[in-house]
Amino acid sequence: MLHDARDRQKFFSDVQYLRDMQHKVDSEYQACLRRQEYRRDPNEKKRDQFWGQETSFERSRFSSRSSSKQSSSEEDALTEPRSSIKISAFKCDSKLPAIDQTSVKQKHKSTMTVRKAEKVDPSEPSPADQAPMVLLRKRKPNLRRFTVSPESHSPRASGDRSRQKQQWPAKVPVPRGADQVVQQEGLMCNTKLKRPNQERRNLVPSSQPMTENAPDRAKKGDPSAPSQSELHPALSQAFQGKNSPQVLSEFSGPPLTPTTVGGPRKASFRFRDEDFYSILSLNSRRESDDTEEETQSEECLWVGVRSPCSPSHHKRSRFGGTSTPQAKNKNFEENAENCRGHSSRRSEPSHGSLRISNAMEPATERPSAGQRLSQDPGLPDRESATEKDRGGSENAKKSPLSWDTKSEPRQEVGVNAENVWSDCISVEHRPGTHDSEGYWKDYLNSSQNSLDYFISGRPISPRSSVNSSYNPPASFMHSALRDDIPVDLSMSSTSVHSSDSEGNSGFHVCQPLSPIRNRTPFASAENHNYFPVNSAHEFAVREAEDTTLTSQPQGAPLYTDLLLNPQGNLSLVDSSSSSPSRMNSEGHLHVSGSLQENTPFTFFAVSHFPNQNDNGSRMAASGFTDEKETSKIKADPEKLKKLQESLLEEDSEEEGDLCRICQIAGGSPSNPLLEPCGCVGSLQFVHQECLKKWLKVKITSGADLGAVKTCEMCKQGLLVDLGDFNMIEFYQKHQQSQAQNELMNSGLYLVLLLHLYEQRFAELMRLNHNQVERERLSRNYPQPRTEENENSELGDGNEGSISQSQVV
């Protein structure tokens, strides 16, 4: 009972302890949740405050647009960078991701380098100003919203602007997917970018002549300067999502500002000056303490995060690198349908007159050695500034390594500057430690930037640069063949740019293509983009497969030699390991002047074109050899059988009859060969002594009498009389001896067990007797007896010491 009560009490105490522990853990968890909510609430309040302040500032800034336009352009050009600097300083960095925080050393280095560059020569544009790729974060209020109407640049009444202001506060979130940032309602182009927690950036190209001309135009009082400074925030809009390849270059460069050709009602909206990039470069210089460090960290993250070969890159060059979205549809109207058509996969070409480039101007300046990127000079025609800036910014965002082609101007009369080829970015070798970063960027571009109608493959060399007046650096890469991507002539591979006396620049590219899967003989890339060629020229696509007779693995690279010139001749030589013959296939695409304006060209890139005749001959040869081999195989078994029979005959003649147990031929009178069962062949004969031993072994192993009398092979009874050996008697004796052994073993076991019991019983009795004695002694003699015994022992010790002293 006592034990049960104790166990019950212990159980209850354990349960209570567990409940207490659970309650304690729950209380701690609740306290932790409350602390997190307490921390979250102030952050949300701060964020709401910042958003409210930004919204109020944006509204005040856009509401004061009419008054600011009446003021001088010099004041606007000065106040706009100052306001952007103030807002960027006012904006806190709490919303930045933790991965963008760089070390103090990197910050110090970046700020010192920028300041030194500014102190060297203030009159000359520094390399930081000349660098076209400026990484901007989406945390500046002046880069947040952008509302543009073509009517805002025309002298209209203030009522129209007030009507636009009423439409302004409606927030339009940035869509993802095919429909892009721009949503137009009538004559209004209103884009709204929410502030995401993820990392956003945009590569903004800035051109040297624009940067140099900015102060001059501001002094002259050009009324377009403030408008450009107000329009440049939309340049830096980016999409939501963190490093997503699908939104890499969805919207690059200036906003989709519709350029109308006809219609008296609709005023054409265009950038009337090229120096709106200069204000952006000035802002980047003044905010170098804040943006340069982020630029370095974001470039590192950009190189590390981007996957080289991602299948989801098929949407990254939506607007095209070297040509603009308005190359397909230049005369689109200012409504949502055409604007979305440009934003989505492809837009229907208009039937108006297409303004193809006559503005392929040679560059006025070459980039310096320390300069990372430079852009071609702006176009003299102001109406083409939108297309130019769009193409340049797209190229800068698409790839740090692009191609800067400077060719002769076209001679068409009614064409407008589209800057399809000249508005690209050239890259030179950076000295010293910057080469490694260039290699990384090259390798990155090899997986991103593409001539999108060719088949994907990895580059041979990460970098190639040829610097001359007609030999700019050209980087090529073959990307996956897709039908919804414009032609991007900036590719990464080993390329050599050559030019002849007539000005036809050609590019010779050695590019590997990996045959990942069996491709169709003719893979066409439809609706890519217009090629800047004359209407009378033709496209010739030549494909020759040159292989060797040696077999190669399936993943062998296909080296493609691409010869490309601006006159429209395209020759493709593709060597693969599919067939051992040479084959030339030519496809000519004749393009007239009217078709050139409205119909996109279809390019054929043939990378795998097997020769069926050669395959058939090879199959026939292989079938012939297979027949020969099968005939040989049929003849071989007959020879083997003959050899085996001859060997068996020789063995039987030499050795004679063998005992199946000891494998010894012949017998003796004392040990003859017997036939105990119905076995034949090599198992027919057994020696007498061998059979006796075998039967004894079977009996002693514990087999039954029936198993002993039966042959293991033929399952027949052994009909032998071994004379002195009686199998039944031996079996009975073995059984008796076995029983006796078992009995003896059991008796011995019992004796040993009884002995152990006796020892255990004696030990228990002794322990019990000792316990009884102790209890009896404890009852007779109480506890203090032990203390008295100790005292008496001490007294005896003292008496002994005294007696010893007396004896001495």
Swiss-Prot record:
Top-rank lineage group of the source organism: Eukaryota
InterPro entries per UniProt: MARCH10_RING_CH-C4HC3, RING-CH-type_E3_ubiq-ligase, Znf_RING-CH, Znf_RING/FYVE/PHD
Key words of the record: Metal-binding, Transferase, Ubl conjugation pathway, Zinc, Zinc-finger
A molecular-function term among this protein's GO annotations: transferase activity
Compositional bias ranges of the Basic and acidic residues kind: 34-49, 330-349, 379-397
Keyword Transferase: yes
Record remark: domains: The RING-CH-type zinc finger domain is required for E3 ligase activity.
The protein's name in its UniProt record: Probable E3 ubiquitin-protein ligase MARCHF10
Catalysed reaction, written as an equation: S-ubiquitinyl-[E2 ubiquitin-conjugating enzyme]-L-cysteine + [acceptor protein]-L-lysine = [E2 ubiquitin-conjugating enzyme]-L-cysteine + N(6)-ubiquitinyl-[acceptor protein]-L-lysine
Enzyme Commission code: 2.3.2.27
Record-level GO BP terms: protein ubiquitination
Zinc fingers, RING-CH-type class: 651-721
Species this protein is from: Homo sapiens
Binding, Zn(2+) 2: C677, C679, C711, C714
Chain positions covered by the region annotation Disordered: 33-81, 101-268, 284-415, 773-808
Entry-linked SUPFAM superfamilies: RING/U-box (SSF57850)
Comp. bias intervals (Polar residues): 237-249
Keyword flag Amino-acid biosynthesis: no
Pathway of action: Protein modification; protein ubiquitination
